[in-house]
Regions:
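Post-transcriptional modification and biogenesis factors for structured RNAs
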Residues: 218, 251-254
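Conserved alpha/beta core segments of nucleic-acid transaction machinery
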Residues: 243-248
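Charged catalytic carboxylate motif
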Residues: 77, 127, 256
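Generic alpha-helical segment signature
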Residues: 165, 254-255
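Active-site cores that bind ATP or allylic diphosphates and position pyrophosphate for catalysis
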Residues: 1-106, 114, 139
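Conserved small/polar residues in nucleotide/adenosyl-binding loops
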Residues: 256-262
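Catalytic adenosine-cofactor/nucleotide-binding cores of aminoacyl-tRNA synthetases and other
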Residues: 86-91, 95-242
Length: 263
């Protein structure tokens, strides 16, 4: 390493071939002649990603580094740092990136990309987990619906596809609908009543619950998200009778001044 304008650069040897096996992409090799000397410590003494992430992996004893394929070109640098620190070289796995419908890397410009945002849109946790598993991997035998236990038992990094996957929200909605339909009637009723009460910000009346329970079986077969529920059943819910304060006062004043008839 050497100092350059206040920063510290790692001196890359010019006559080496860095080789490693990638679980997704197979045998990889990079010529160090194609890798420039890189900064590991900025002029303000803060470490760069290359140094910080590598030291962190060493410190935690990471044996498999799984990350996006956009970091693949940085792997030779990280291996050189590990060798310089006399650390064991872990296994690597560079996963395909997710793309939007326009063929560009998935980002906020495509709309919602956080799990919490999809949860608020009515996507079930199990459905989201299931769908994300299918982006670049498959358990085989054309199986699309499975729980986390099944996925864990079947998952193998060697079977992850190297090709980038497209995040298809329509497919996610379809999958979410399948999970809703596979929910037990009792669980669906419980979740639905809670969902409606959250929308109303009040508890349902017994009469309303009775009406809703009768229609839930047919609604369960139609909706794709729990957010679709309220629009399907709103006509069965009693609207609260709201009286303007001034009107209420005028009515109460009138009744308090009524004279009871006498014999």
């Amino acid at each position: 390493a050497y100092k350059d304008d206040g920063a510290i650069r790692f001196k890359v040897p010019s006559d080496r071939t860095i080789e490693f096996k990638d679980f997704v992409r197979g045998d990889m090799s990079f010529e160090t002649s194609d890798v420039e000397d890189f900064v590991i410590l900025r002029s303000d003494n803060t470490p760069t990603y290359h140094l910080a992430s590598t030291v962190d992996d060493i410190d935690y004893g990471i044996t498999i580094i799984a990350r996006g394929e956009d970091i693949l070109s940085s792997t030779p640098k990280h291996i050189l740092i590990m060798e310089a620190l006399d650390a064991a070289i872990p296994n690597f796995c560079h996963l395909p990136l997710l793309f939007g419908p326009d063929g560009k890397k998935l980002s906020k410009r495509h709309g919602d990309t956080s799990v919490e945002a999809f949860r608020q849109k009515g996507i079930l946790n199990d459905a989201m987990f299931n769908y994300l598993c299918l982006l670049g991997w498959s358990p085989g035998d054309d199986i699309e619906l499975f729980d986390s236990d099944f996925a864990i038992s079947k998952f193998d990094l060697n079977k992850v596809l190297p090709n980038s996957a497209t995040f298809d929200e329509k497919k996610l909605l379809w999958l979410n609908g399948q999970y809703i339909r596979s929910t037990s009637p009792n669980k669906f009723e419980e979740d639905s009543l809670q969902n409606i009460e959250n929308q109303l910000s009040r508890e349902l009346f017994h009469e309303e619950k009775d009406r809703l329970l009768k229609i839930f079986p047919s609604v369960q077969e139609r909706i794709e998200t729990m957010n679709d529920l309220f629009g399907q059943v709103q006509f069965l819910i009693d609207e609260p009778f709201i009286v303007d304060k001034e009107d209420w006062e005028s009515v109460t004043v009138s009744y308090t001044h009524l004279t009871l008839p006498t014999k």
